[in-house]
Every structure is written in C-alpha cells, then in structure tokens.
C-alpha cells in the first residue's frame, strides 16, 4: 500500500465508494466479482478496475475459488477503522438529523419526518419535510425560524415544515401529500396521530 497521499487512490471515484460501501455493509462476507458488482449497482468491468487499486491498498483480499475470484474485505487492514467510521457516520446521518430535530423542535402534539429524506431518495438540494400538529399554530410558526436557520446551517438542506392544527390535520387525510406521507414517515416527537386519525 501507499503511505502518503493515498485517499485519491482509495476513494477516487463513485465506483470505489460504492464497492467499499457494499464491502463494509457485509463485512465478513465472501463475494464473487459479479455478486459484488450487482449489490453495488455497478457494471462488472469498472468493479474489476477498482478492485485492483483496493487490493493494492491492502483493503481487499482476492482468492481463487475454482475458476472464479473470491473477494473479501481485509478487516486487519490499517485503513479498516477509519473507513469503517466513515461509512458508519454515513449510515447514521438521518438518525443524527432526527436527534437534532428532537432537540430543536418546540413541543407539539406530533412531529414527523416524511418525504425524500425519510424514504432515502433525496438529492443534494432536497428539502427536509416535517409535519407538525399543534394546538397553537401561530406560536409554533413563530418558533420555527430559529430551527430553520440551525438545521439549514448544519445540514445545508432547506427546512420545510407543514404546521397544522388538530382540526386541519384531520381534514387533510385525503390530500395528495397526506396519502404519500402515510405510507412512509418517522415520528420525531409526540403521538402517532397518523395511525390514530388517518388510518382508522
């Protein structure tokens, strides 16, 4: 392996990052190159090219198993711990957002995360969609400006809350966004009023 300026070689393109993400997700698993390519969502040839560099950096081991090569993550590699921490941080990114929202949001009847961030289909510029149900809509709206500033400052995404009274929430059951929301959401605080009022 190299000992200086090696991150370009390890993480230098999307293919390598996707391959490493798969290897760390299934640490200990033995892969054929074809299986590794399939799980990583990448074509076979670029995976082969990436594996040559990763093997050279002592991150993967390649063994002959009959006519095929078997790939395993080298968990004794000097680079295993920093990369493990990197992918763990990525895996927990949404949970860190939820933890911050739990701290920052004012007390409400219900706060839920929904939309692309919840489903995992977000893009770089996607909004953070939050639904809040409260007895005092105006008071909560006034308190959200500081939350919006802090969330955007920390995560870079625009904070996009929908604030409803309990009466408005009950009436919103058949709106298009409500039908989508009810299929995939995460309760941040308060009670699950979606299950109580929308799914009756």
Show the residue positions of the predicted features.
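Catalytic core of pol beta-like nucleotidyltransferases
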Residues: 1-107, 119-125, 134-200
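Short helix-loop-helix/strand-helix junction enriched in hydrophobic and basic residues
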Residues: 110-117
């Amino acid at each position: 392996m190299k000992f200086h300026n090696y991150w370009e070689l390890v993480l230098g393109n999307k293919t390598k990052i996707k391959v490493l993400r798969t290897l760390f997700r299934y640490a200990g698993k033995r892969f054929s190159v074809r299986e590794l390519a399939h799980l990583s969502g990448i074509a076979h040839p670029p995976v082969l090219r990436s594996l040559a560099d990763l093997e050279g950096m002592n991150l993967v081991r390649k063994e002959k198993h009959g006519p095929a090569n078997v790939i395993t993550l080298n968990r004794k590699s000097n680079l295993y711990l920093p990369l493990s921490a990197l992918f763990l941080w990525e895996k927990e990114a949404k949970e860190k957002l939820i933890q911050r929202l739990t701290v920052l949001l004012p007390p409400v009847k219900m706060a839920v995360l929904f939309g692309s961030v919840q489903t995992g289909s977000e893009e770089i510029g996607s909004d953070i969609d939050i639904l809040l149900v409260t007895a005092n809509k105006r008071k909560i709206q006034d308190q959200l400006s500081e939350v919006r500033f802090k969330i955007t400052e920390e995560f870079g995404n625009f904070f996009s809350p929908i604030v409803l009274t309990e009466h408005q929430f009950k009436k919103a059951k058949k709106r298009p966004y409500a039908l989508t929301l009810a299929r995939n959401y995460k309760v941040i605080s308060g009670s699950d009023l979606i299950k109580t009022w929308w799914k009756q």
